[in-house]
Design a protein with these regions (language model features):
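Alpha/beta-hydrolase superfamily serine-hydrolase fold, recognizing
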Residues: 4-347
Length: 347
């Protein structure tokens, strides 16, 4: 065997070993996420006497995880229509569950909003743009049942956290950017005039710079969702995901919240500047570096900053919708009265 062939074989063996180790490493990550998702099935009780929650309504059967929760105020006048908030949870596209967002979302719903909290299929089994397709399906399901809920579809809010904020921001762009919607071959769920705001917690909005944030496991998240190792160059639809590129003057007023120790802080600053350039009203809740607020601090509801975040969200909503955001009095708690809501769930 000559020297060239010997080194060729050694290189091939080295590449094979590295590939096996990488595959094993990724499998460990996927197994960990799977175990986390199984653990997530334990029901989270909402200890909020001012709301009703209708859980795990099936909105479609095409993809797995096609379930949603609806949170409403206890008191809903049949003559008064309420703004609706559609929410997408985070988890890096590969994990997470809607139920963990319900305690915070209930604090918003009790002020006079109907919240629709949407689950979706997870990567790597279900890649881009599956969650966005499912969001379309979820909004359609709610619209088809509009006679059974006092929803004002001229007062729509789109929201999400972490990867869910990226999804929610892109879903909002799909509604307000004709070119993006046509390129993605999506139907329009809402006209720009119907969307009164976007609420985004700790999201990321520029796929060309998100790797630079060094967010933990960002490589795993993006590869799982796009199917590409080098997503910035190899994934043909990467620009569709960058809301900093897809937002237009039709983008709705936006509330951006991020911790000062969150690696995605720079992404939120960049997005806020882009919206300002477009003359889109934007509320920001950013901190000065002394609060040490990590990713998803908003959901640690006992933190003073989390309490402040909810107050700022309600102020934003009161300025952009008909609900006042005034604190409610406690009412007797009603848990999961799903038989009282005459929807047409598929389950």
């Amino acid at each position: 065997m000559n020297k060239d062939n010997k080194w060729t074989m050694i290189n091939a063996l080295f590449i094979t070993v590295i590939s096996v180790l990488l595959a094993f490493h990724l499998k460990q990550h996927y197994d960990q996420i799977t175990n986390e998702n199984h653990a997530n099935k334990d029901k989270i009780n909402i200890k909020n006497k001012n709301v009703r929650i209708y859980q795990n309504l099936t909105y479609n059967r095409v993809f797995p995880n096609s379930k949603l929760d609806i949170i409403t105020p206890v008191d809903m006048s049949s003559n008064a229509k309420l703004p609706v908030i559609f929410w997408m949870h985070g988890g890096g596209y590969i994990a997470g569950d809607k139920q963990y967002k319900n305690p915070l979302l209930a604090k918003i719903a009790e002020q006079g909003y109907i919240v629709v909290n949407v689950n979706y299929a997870l990567a790597p089994q279900y890649k881009y743009p599956t969650p966005l397709i499912q969001m379309n399906q979820a909004t359609q399901f709610i619209k088809e049942n509009k006679m059974n809920l006092p929803i004002d579809f001229n007062q729509v809010i789109i929201g999400g956290d972490s990867a869910g904020a990226q999804l929610a921001s892109q879903f909002t762009a799909i509604q307000t950017n004709d070119r993006l919607r046509e390129a993605m071959k999506f139907d329009q769920s809402f006209k720009p005039s119907q969307i009164k705001g976007a609420i985004l917690f700790g999201g990321f909005y520029n796929m060309q710079t998100v790797r630079e944030t060094e967010f933990p496991r960002i490589q795993l998240f993006m590869k799982s969702y796009t199917g590409e190792e080098d997503w910035e160059k190899s994934f043909k639809n990467i620009s569709q995901m960058s809301t900093v590129k897809q937002s237009t003057k039709n983008y709705p007023p936006t509330f951006l919240s991020v911790g000062d120790s969150d690696p995605f802080e720079s992404q939120n600053i960049e997005f806020s500047k882009k919206l300002q350039e477009l003359n889109v009203p934007v509320d920001t809740l950013f901190y000065d570096g002394t609060h040490h607020l990590h990713h998803q601090y908003q959901f640690h509801l006992n933190k003073p900053e989390s309490i402040d975040n909810i107050k700022k969200v309600l102020l934003f909503l009161s300025r952009n919708t008909s609900s006042s955001g005034i604190q409610t009095e406690e009412k007797p708690q009603i848990e999961n009265p799903s038989n009282e809501l005459p929807l047409n769930p598929l389950n």
